[in-house]
Amino acid sequence: ALAVDHAGENIRANTLSLGPTADDRFFSQWSSEEEAHQNSSTLFNRLGMPEEMASGAVFLASDDSSFVTGTDLLIDGGYTAK
């Protein structure tokens, strides 16, 4: 694993798994029924915003995650728990 192979070099290796994300391109093509179905796919009954997804990447790239490696950060609004 990348995290194991490079830990001695103080290199962190993590991944992001993103859930359903709001995007104007999709909203413009969805009927109100499709939009309601997509929104209901998460525990918060809405899609994630792009900035919410980006915050995970910012966290992993920051010093705040200096002791985080070998993990997958799941940002999906509870989609996988549902």
Task: Identify what each model region corresponds to.
Residues 46-75, 80-81:
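C-terminal substrate-recognition "lid" of short-chain dehydrogenase/reductases
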Residues 4-8, 21, 48, 61:
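A short hydrophobic alpha-helix cap/turn motif
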